[in-house]
């Protein structure tokens, strides 16, 4: 089985229908199958609250996800991936869009660039392993005019790859915008990219349980190599192992915007001063002290999802009660706190006792969390989430 097939996460039915659509286009040299696709198979798409469309994942571990939050697919792109970036549009901008999907994040970046730039240039490198996922971006109605620019870049590459055969998209890509589309495993792409080059990285795969290979510590080390010192990575997830992976690969981390979810996503940068908000205090404690903060590993950037998930589970089991406090009932967040719930207290203190911590209010508990006494939401070079987590 090819890695692309193994890594494929969009719904199998829509995947097959898209492939069939473009096969008809290639065989007939006729655009009708592409033009009629959305109306014919509209039920396979998910209409989000802002009027833009998303698609479903296949069922993995008894779960089905969509590519975007139901609150609004294109709105999510602006809120989570564009607004936190603080681009200086007086200078040229370079963006790496990992798991480009339907092209919404790149389209939002183009819209913001056109609105705010004068004589600067924008380069976007879009990376997506699945031709069908990119092709789906050609089939959905454009949620904003700039999506037509992205569609043209996608179409050009799909024609080069002999997946599409007709140049149908009429929008011209502006001369000061350069869009490169890589249809391959992002782990291989990134190893060939230039050092210290990108102002922003958009990391937008399906969840860590579906694509842990794109959330590994080792993948993030490549991010650290290619991003500029003031560059920012944005991802929707608030996952502890993802944030731990960023920290262990040399990044500072902060909380991203809350949009369509209960928690904010994650922002990462070599420079803490470009990150507005620290992680929530309890998140810092769990990452630092419990086994939930053990990152995903993929040392040679070539393992499959199941292997990475299984290996992390094994490492967690070995670390639990030895080098890490058990994450059960979120044990570490109760350190230094008095507990009224006796049943919960017994469970927490049983976990703590296995690490030679007598109680939640013992001197050991207060010593471990000493650095959190200086917690503040605004980050600076000395007082920030990364430093507090490493101190613990």
List where the protein language model places each region.
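Conserved beta-strand signature within the Rossmann-like core of class I S-adenosyl-L-methionine
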Residues: 200-202, 229-237
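Glycine-rich SAM-binding Motif I of class I
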Residues: 102-107
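SAM/dcSAM-binding transferase cores
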Residues: 2-8, 21, 26, 31, ...
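Conserved Class I S-adenosyl-L-methionine
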Residues: 243-267
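S-adenosyl-L-methionine
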Residues: 136-193
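A short glycine-rich, Lys/Arg-flanked "PGG" loop and its adjoining helix->strand segment in the class I
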Residues: 213-229
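Class I SAM-dependent methyltransferase core
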Residues: 95-97, 101
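Rossmann-like AdoMet
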Residues: 1-93, 111-149, 153-154, 167
């Amino acid at each position: 089985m090819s890695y692309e097939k193994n890594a494929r996460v969009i719904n199998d039915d829509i995947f097959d229908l898209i492939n069939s659509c473009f096969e008809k286009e290639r065989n007939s040299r006729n655009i009708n199958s592409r033009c009629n696709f959305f109306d014919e198979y509209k039920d396979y798409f998910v209409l989000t609250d802002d009027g833009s469309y998303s698609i479903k994942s296949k069922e993995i571990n008894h779960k089905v996800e969509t590519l975007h939050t139901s609150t609004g697919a294109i709105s999510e792109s602006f809120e989570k991936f564009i607004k936190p970036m603080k681009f200086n549009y007086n200078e040229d901008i370079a963006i790496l869009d990992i798991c480009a999907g339907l092209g919404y994040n790149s389209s939002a970046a183009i819209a913001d660039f056109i609105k705010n730039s004068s004589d600067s240039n924008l380069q976007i490198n879009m990376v997506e392993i699945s031709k069908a996922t990119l092709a789906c971006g050609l089939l959905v109605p454009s949620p904003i005019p700039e999506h037509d620019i992205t569609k043209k870049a996608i179409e050009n590459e799909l024609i080069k790859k002999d997946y599409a055969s007709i140049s149908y998209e009429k929008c011209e890509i502006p001369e000061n915008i350069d869009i490169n589309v890589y249809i391959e495993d992002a782990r291989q792409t990134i190893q060939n990219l230039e050092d210290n080059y990108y102002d922003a990285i958009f990391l937008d795969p399906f969840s860590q349980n579906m694509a842990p290979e794109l959330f590994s510590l080792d993948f993030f080390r490549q991010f650290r190599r290619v991003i500029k010192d003031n560059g920012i990575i944005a991802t929707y997830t608030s996952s502890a192992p993802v944030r731990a992976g960023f920290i262990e690969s040399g990044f500072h981390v902060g909380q991203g915007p809350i949009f369509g979810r209960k928690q904010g996503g994650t922002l990462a940068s070599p420079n803490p001063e470009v990150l507005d908000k620290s992680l929530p205090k309890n998140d810092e404690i769990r990452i630092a002290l419990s086994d939930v903060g053990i990152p995903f590993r993929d040392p040679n950037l070539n393992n499959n999802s199941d292997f990475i998930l299984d290996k992390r589970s094994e490492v967690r089991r070995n670390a639990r009660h030895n080098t890490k406090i058990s994450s059960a009932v979120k044990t570490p967040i109760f350190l230094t706190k008095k507990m009224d719930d006796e049943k919960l207290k017994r469970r927490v203190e049983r976990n703590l006792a296995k690490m030679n911590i007598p109680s939640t209010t013992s001197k050991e508990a207060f010593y471990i969390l000493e650095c959190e006494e200086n917690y503040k939401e605004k980050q600076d070079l000395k007082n920030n989430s990364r430093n507090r987590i490493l101190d613990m």
